[in-house]
C-alpha cells in the first residue's frame, strides 16, 4: 500500500503519485467506499492523450455509475489490466493494486495535499 500522505489529490477523489514525469492515478478509499462494490471499470487506452478535468473512463458499482476524470494532461503509458479483470481491487486496495492508469506528463497542475483532501471530505 502506498503512503497516502505522500500522494496528491483532486476534488473528484482521485489520487496521484508522481515518479519523475509519470503519474500513477487511482481513486481514493473515500470514493471507493461511497461507490460500494465496484463491478466494472472502463479505462482509457495506452497512447490516449488526456486533458485534465475531462472524463476518461467509467466505474460501475452495485450502487451507481461514476465517471473517471483525468487529473492531469498527458499520455497514458500503462493501464491496470488487473483492475479491468478484477474491479473489486478498487475496493480492496485502492491505494495499491487498485491503481488505474499511468500518465506521462509535461507539467503537473497544483493538486490537493493529503491534509487538504482530508479537510475536503471531512475524514
UniProtKB/Swiss-Prot annotation:
Tell me the GO BP annotations in alphabetical order. Answer: glycine decarboxylation via glycine cleavage system
Q: Which residues form the Lipoyl-binding domain?
A: 22-104
Q: Its GO CC terms?
A: cytosol; glycine cleavage complex
Q: Which Pfam families match?
A: GCV_H
UniProt remark on cofactor binding = Binds 1 lipoyl cofactor covalently.
Residues spanning the signal sequence: none
Q: Which InterPro entries match?
A: 2-oxoA_DH_lipoyl-BS, Biotin_lipoyl, GCV_H, GCV_H/Fam206, GCV_H_sub, Single_hybrid_motif
What UniProt keywords apply to this chain's record, in alphabetical order? Lipoyl
The cofactor named in the record is: (R)-lipoate
Question: Positions modified as N6-lipoyllysine?
Answer: 63
Q: Which family does it belong to?
A: Belongs to the GcvH family.
How is the quaternary structure described? The glycine cleavage system is composed of four proteins: P, T, L and H.
> What does the function comment of this entry state?
The glycine cleavage system catalyzes the degradation of glycine. The H protein shuttles the methylamine group of glycine from the P protein to the T protein.
Q: What is this protein called?
A: Glycine cleavage system H protein
Source organism (scientific name): Clavibacter michiganensis subsp. michiganensis (strain NCPPB 382)
The organism's taxonomic lineage, starting at the top: Bacteria, Bacillati, Actinomycetota, Actinomycetes, Micrococcales
**Gene name on record?**
gcvH
Amino acid at each position: 500500500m502506498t503512503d497516502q500522505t505522500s500522494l496528491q489529490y483532486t476534488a473528484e477523489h482521485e489520487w496521484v503519485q508522481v515518479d519523475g514525469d509519470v503519474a500513477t492515478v487511482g481513486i481514493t478509499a473515500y470514493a471507493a467506499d461511497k461507490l460500494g462494490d465496484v463491478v466494472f471499470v472502463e479505462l482509457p487506452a495506452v497512447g490516449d492523450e488526456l486533458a485534465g478535468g475531462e472524463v476518461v473512463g467509467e466505474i460501475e458499482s452495485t450502487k451507481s455509475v461514476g465517471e473517471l476524470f483525468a487529473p492531469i494532461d498527458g499520455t497514458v503509458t500503462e493501464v491496470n489490466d488487473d483492475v479491468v479483470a478484477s474491479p473489486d481491487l478498487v475496493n480492496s486496495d485502492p491505494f495499491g493494486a487498485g491503481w488505474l492508469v499511468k500518465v506521462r506528463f509535461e507539467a503537473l497542475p497544483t493538486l490537493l495535499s493529503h491534509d487538504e483532501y482530508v479537510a475536503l471530505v471531512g475524514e
